[in-house]
Amino acid sequence: RIKKFDFNKEYTHVKSYWRKYVKEDNGLELKEPTNSYEEKIQDIYRRSILLFPLLTNQTTGGVIAAPEVDEELTQCGRYGYCWPRDAIFIAKALDILKMTKETEKFYSNFCRMTQSKNGMWEQRFYTDGKLAPCWGYQVDETASVVYGVYSHYEYTKNEEFLKANLHMCEKAIDFLKKYVKDILEKTGIYHVSYDLWEMYEGIHLYSLASIFSAFDSMIKIYGVLGKNISDFENNRLKEEKISKSIDEMSNLKIEIKKYIDENLYDENRKSYVRNADDKRIDISLLGAVVPFKVFSPKEKRVLNTVENINLTIRTYTGGYQRFEYDHYRNGAPWPIANLWMTLYYLENGEKKKAKETFDFVLKTAGKHSFLGEQIDNNTLKPNWVIGLGWSHAMFVIVLEKLNKM
């Protein structure tokens, strides 16, 4: 049977299949490149389109963080799990590419099957929905799911999707309300969560920003559905409960913003800090602007923070580290960090600076146009895990923003 295998025929068939796949999923409708700069962008863009389905469990909708070649998960990056946070960014990229069925399966199937009884999501899962080894939950993952559900609606305008996932979101919101009240009232009932880098426990600005956005998204979900919520139509008790919840979330949004300003802004450094205890500058501080919109990009404190980011975690090559004194794998720059800076600069209308931070990602992509988790500052080549879904998702999100300008 091996002798009868026509390699050239099979190669042509596979090549044709994936070329058709890329063409059909060119959601941004990018035109053919006219120069080497545009060609580089197209190469990474196409690679992203090809990468996402390879990370996705087509049955459950679960999305792993990066390709994992070791089935025992001991010799590689151990990234063959689904982190809700990473997956939410990838889901947004899928929506941009008009792969909306894949996004809907992630939320309507995978997220619903993995939600805990108390409304939260644990740190990470196998793509079949089973709980993976965990060492500490991150509250931003729970908040990000609610944010992501409404984000998906913004692309599809599918009210049935919102109705189908309403109960899931309400359970998550109930958990987040209790978590925030615990912080504000200092009751100590809920254990503080880890940060998005899974390294430090505490009350983190990024986490609070994600919760702010979850409340905002839930208010908008109720606004879209109005009184036309399946199973609750003409139910006065349900309407009263929703009205009360909206008021409560609106007040908690105000309290979160107040807490951040009073506890997570360092007057000496003239900067927001990631945590009240360690007060380090962190690229995730930008999350309060994009995507979570707690602050506008032009607010004085935000501008001061961006200046501090450039002074502390921008390296001599133009790449950005995750945070001050980041020693993980020698504190290399992360494409995610550069792309986050790019998104901020685009939000603030600073196109020249946006191009500078974006170009670093272009010139450090691998020879097959994969984006790594990190960049070696000496060789300017991808370092550690290569083909990181979050990096490629952020790249697509940046391209969408550029296309709208």
Language-model features: locations:
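C-terminal capping/lid segments that line or modulate ligand- or cofactor-binding pockets
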Residues: 79, 90, 125-127, 132-155, ...
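Extended ligand-binding clefts on enzyme/binding-domain cores
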Residues: 44, 204-210, 232-336
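Aromatic-rich carbohydrate-recognition surfaces in CAZymes
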Residues: 14, 79-183, 208, 212, ...
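Active-site acid/base region of carbohydrate-active enzymes
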Residues: 30-61, 110, 114-120, 134, ...
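Long, well-ordered core segments of solenoidal/helical folds
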Residues: 50-59, 98-121, 165-187, 238-241, ...
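Acidic/polar, glycine-enriched structural segments that form the non-catalytic walls/loops
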Residues: 1-78, 159-160
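Acidic/His metal-coordination segments adjacent to aromatic residues that form catalytic metal sites
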Residues: 69-76, 121-137, 182-203, 263-267, ...
